[in-house]
Amino acid sequence: PADIESLSVLKDAASCALYGNRASNGVILITTKKGTAGKLSFDLKVNQGIYTRGIKEYARTDARQFMEASWQNLRNARISAGDAPDVAARYASDNLIGEQLYLNIFNKPDKELFDANGHLADGVQMLPGYAEDLDWYKAAIRNGYRQEYLFSGNAANEKSDYYFSLGYLDEEGYVRNSSFDRLSARVSVNLTPVKWLKAGVNLSGSHQNSQITAGDQGASFANAFMYCRQIAPIYPVHLHNADGSYRLTADGKRQYDPGYYTNDQGVETATRNQYVDRHVVWENELDKNRTVRNTLQGIAYMDVKFLKDFTFTVKGDMNLSQSDNNAYNNAIIGDGKGSEGRARRETLRYKSYTFQQQLKWTHLFGPHLFDVLVAHENYSYNYDYMYGFKTAQIFPDRPNFNNFTEITSLDGYEDNYRTESYLGRIRYNYRDRYNLEVSFRRDGSSRFHPDNRWGNFGSVGANWIISEEEFMKGVRWVNNLKLRANYGQVGNDAGAGYYGYMS
């Protein structure tokens, strides 16, 4: 964004018609920076910032409130089923933990937690160790950190201008174990060695790395925000012993709670009634979803002036992009557990180029200015995609495909798309007050059958700058008043598919 000089949006029919079928929804013109007159100068910009939550979380019940509300829910359900109120109350006190919640984080036995009215009994306190372990947001979220550096330089004289920039962006995401970094560069050079010749080139490229967490969709079990919001406030992040202390691994680390614990005899005991075998913090630590993306864009042009009023322009642009995504789901917790771990890889390559030749004639006959343009353009697009999915890992924490034994899916495809266009435009201007424009364009698209590949599109537009008229000179509160009308047609091949006519 720091390399952008200006941005314009064209939505009227006359402007869009000149750009053909790819402009059916409008045109965005982006002008990047170039060298400015003067000696070589340098600029360094440094931005530092943090990400924090801007909107507070909804008010939520705490552990004690949740227990009492759960008791009332079970008691009312039993009354609805036909139990007397006192029988339903006794049933709720005796069975709330064993039948519904599965975990008692307080210092009294399961059946002694509540009084006859469903309130936690006197002396009921949370066991030590649990209070600090019920905040899932604290375990899953952090303050994100962003640092950005941009170094640029520019210079210009009568025959040339130069601009370059080098940028680096590094972000630590708001959700733990998410990150993004990008290295980018741009070079722009414009030369006018003689009066009748001008040429230039604009090159830019970037290298990006991103690590995202699971659960992009709001309903995903691995979505940190949904998980932390919906898990009951009595369920801890880690497993605890009967006295409330943390259960530790052989190397002394706290064990995450997958919704159950396994004793020495291999018997599993449930520790919660939701998100069993899911754990947003644990999954984000073990899983990986990394994307590496490289881009290169280049634009070159040359203007040749001849016979006083004529200009011949050759333009070309190229876009290259390569992206490689590697995703890994571990075999311990979450999506990969049932398949003994799984790996996914997506690779895509994209390239396009546009080549355009323009001949322009401009001449002034007194107050009458004529501008005539004829041009030819061709565009080529190629997209190559490959997808692979494997399961059953051999070694943990190794997302490479050769570490998995079962091929679940292997697919790929390639898309090719080409257009060719011939266009013409005539502009007329009288004393900068009255303007008339007529354009015609003939487009051919590879998306259509050869017998119906070409379409003709035209436009006409006019405007009257009323504020330039003599009768408006005395109106000081109006500095620009324009009446404009236009009509045009543009093609649209976006919905046709690349090979629809072959089916």
Give the ranges of each region predicted by the language model:
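Residues on the lipid-exposed face of transmembrane beta-strands in outer-membrane beta-barrel proteins
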Residues: 32, 151-157, 185-191, 298-304, ...
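Surface-exposed loop/interface segments of Gram-negative outer-membrane beta-barrel transport/assembly proteins
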Residues: 37-132, 143, 173-178, 184, ...
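Transmembrane beta-barrel architecture of outer membranes
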Residues: 146-150, 180-186, 421, 455-459
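N-terminal periplasmic accessory domains that precede
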Residues: 17, 23-46, 149-151
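Transmembrane beta-strand segments that form the barrel wall of outer-membrane beta-barrel proteins
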Residues: 166-172, 436-445
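Outer-membrane beta-barrel initiation region
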Residues: 139-144, 153-157
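A generic beta-sheet turn/junction motif
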Residues: 23, 155-159, 168, 363-367, ...
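Short acidic/polar hinge/loop motifs at secondary-structure boundaries
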Residues: 1-11
